[in-house]
Every structure is written in C-alpha cells, then in structure tokens.
Amino acid sequence: MKKKTSLSEEDQALFRQLMTGTRQIKQDTIVHRPQRKKITEVPVKRLIQEQADASHYFSDEFQPLLNTDGPVKYVRADVSHFELKKMRRGDYSPELFLDLHGLTQQQAKQELGALIAACRREHVFCACVMHGHGKHILKQQTPLWLAQHPHVMAFHQAPKEYGGDAALLVLIEVEEWLPPELP
C-alpha cells in the first residue's frame, strides 16, 4: 500500500536532497518510571477524624423546630431567606451527591458527617442528599440532623431533576479559599 502525502513531487525531492548524508538516531535512552510516594496513615486518620467531628453534631434526642407545612426547608438565622428561594428555583446545582438508601440511621449520620467534611475540604458550596421515600425514617431524621450542624447554612426539598421530595439540596458554609502565598 502506497503512503499518501500532501507534498508535491517537487517538495518531496527537495526534502530527500536536504536529508542526504543524515542517519537515523538510535534510541538508547531508558525511561524510568517515577517512584510513587508512600501513602502515609496521617491523611486517613485525618479523614476519619473530620468525619467523626462532623457527625458529632447529630443527635436523635434534640428536635429542632422545623416548619412542617409544605416542602422541607430550613435556613440558619444569619443566612438570608432569599437563599431558600434560589434553592427552590433551582439556581444552585449540587456538586456532590449522597445517597442514603439502604443505610441504617447510624451509617446515615456518619455519611452525612463525611459529606459535610468533604464539602468543606473541597470548597463545595451545594450538595444533594437523597434520603428516599422508604419507611420515612431517614426522610424524617435527615432534616433534623442537618439543622443541628453549624456548617449547614440552609436546605430545601430538591427540585424534580435532583430527586424531588426524596432529596434535599444543602448549602454548606465553606472556609474562604485563599491562594497560596508566593515566596
């Protein structure tokens, strides 16, 4: 099979003329794979500690006063009620999703704590928590737990595209991100 080139016969002849007397370079370089850094136990311990710290706020005995009329919603006292309206309209799109289907209450608390810690660590402002319909245990408990956490600014029943009444959109207070200082 003949190779097709876009060069004319004249250009090909000129190229061959310029390449006379050259020889092919022998490739004798060995490329070493970069050594992987050993994963230390400190980050794993830190993640577990963040998760435990975040789930520490969730109590089954404390019942925050939430509005039971209409969709599930909550806004912290120092946050504008306009944020709820923006959540209801779908102005926020969640970057992280948490599915609590099939989890026990204890597992759900741990996962909620891990989600909030991950949002703060990754500077994610909005997340979606899918509690499902099921036996309504997690559906009732999830808003009560979220309202107790100091880093939860607000939550509202999710729009249809994110799960409707089987999910919540949650606004998380993230630390102000500062770029690293240059030396």
From Swiss-Prot:
Arranged from A to Z, the UniProt key words for this protein are:
Endonuclease, Hydrolase, Nuclease, RNA-binding, rRNA-binding
PROSITE patterns in alphabetical order: SMR
InterPro entries of this UniProt entry? Smr_dom, Smr_dom_sf, SmrB-like
Q: Which protein are we looking at? A: Ribosome rescue factor SmrB
Q: Does the keyword Hydrolase apply?
A: yes
**Pfam families attached here?**
Smr
Q: What class of enzyme is it?
A: hydrolase
Named from the GO MF annotations, one term is: RNA endonuclease activity
Q: Subunit details for this protein?
A: Associates with collided ribosomes, but not with correctly translating polysomes.
Instruction: Tell me which SUPFAM superfamilies the record gives.
Output: SMR domain-like
GO terms for biological process, alphabetical? rescue of stalled ribosome
Q: What is the lineage of its organism?
A: Bacteria, Pseudomonadati, Pseudomonadota, Gammaproteobacteria, Enterobacterales
Q: EC number(s) on record? A: 3.1.-.-
| UniProt similarity note | Belongs to the SmrB family.
